[in-house]
């Protein structure tokens, strides 16, 4: 059986970019709290940030969604043209996320084969949804991606690993030389540390 989770090219901001302002929470969070996103916008200001290249779902009902999508795509192209990114080729990132309570959650960043994914209830596909998909949110998500030169996935995949042999084993395989980022997240989001896997 082919595993639908793979190594890929991962873009990260080059050194000198403020990672705290660059990294924002997923677009499907705080969907009824406009004040959260207003504060993020205020914090980011004119700095490079993923805030400028995602469509927070709190804005989905706004009349200016089409304009926002156009601006997102323009900004993505600007970031690429301005050479903001370093490319980590054919790799995965082992991640340690410390939340605001101090609890550490470990994870792995890579690429998922969307042909193996099915969000329909009762699906037996290799990759399937653990919660109900809000169908109405799919069209604007797809529309953002039509002309987008960058992908900003924000999904979390749960894996069957009863013996804890995958994620847990990685912490013993990385060293301080493998660290590609290590910073506090904005808005009391905790801390994140990423290690490039060789």
PLM segments and residue spans:
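N-terminal extension/subdomain marker
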Residues: 1-191
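Active-site beta-strand/loop microenvironment that shapes enzyme catalytic pockets
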Residues: 195-198
